[in-house]
Swiss-Prot record:
InterPro entries: Ankyrin_rpt (IPR002110), Ankyrin_rpt-contain_sf (IPR036770)
Gene3D superfamilies: Ankyrin repeat-containing domain
A Pfam cross-reference name: Ank_4
UniProt KW Secreted keyword: no
Name of the protein in its database record: Putative ankyrin repeat protein RF_pd14
Keyword Hydrolase carried by entry: no
Positions of disulphide bridges: none
Keywords: ANK repeat, Plasmid
Superkingdom of origin: Bacteria
Species name: Rickettsia felis (strain ATCC VR-1525 / URRWXCal2) (Rickettsia azadi)
ANK repeat ranges per the UniProt record: 14-66
Length: 66
């Protein structure tokens, strides 16, 4: 569950969830595409992590340069 301040389950919320998964698994191409489509890199999950913190915590430091 994401904690972004978005009413309802919007397309942007779907993008944000995909971004979190892509960042956590090191899928840099997907991260780039999702950010270009409007995903919010500052959105936080239920544990307070952002996509960038998930990427860094998993060792995918190249994602931090996006």
């Amino acid at each position: 569950m994401l904690l972004c301040k978005i009413k309802g389950y919007t397309e942007r919320q779907k993008l944000n969830q995909k971004l979190m998964r892509a960042a956590a698994t090191g899928d840099i191409e997907a991260v780039q595409k999702l950010v270009l489509r409007g995903a919010d890199i500052y959105c936080r999950d239920h544990q307070g992590d952002t996509a960038l913190s998930l990427a860094a915590g998993s060792g995918y430091l190249d994602i931090l340069d996006i």
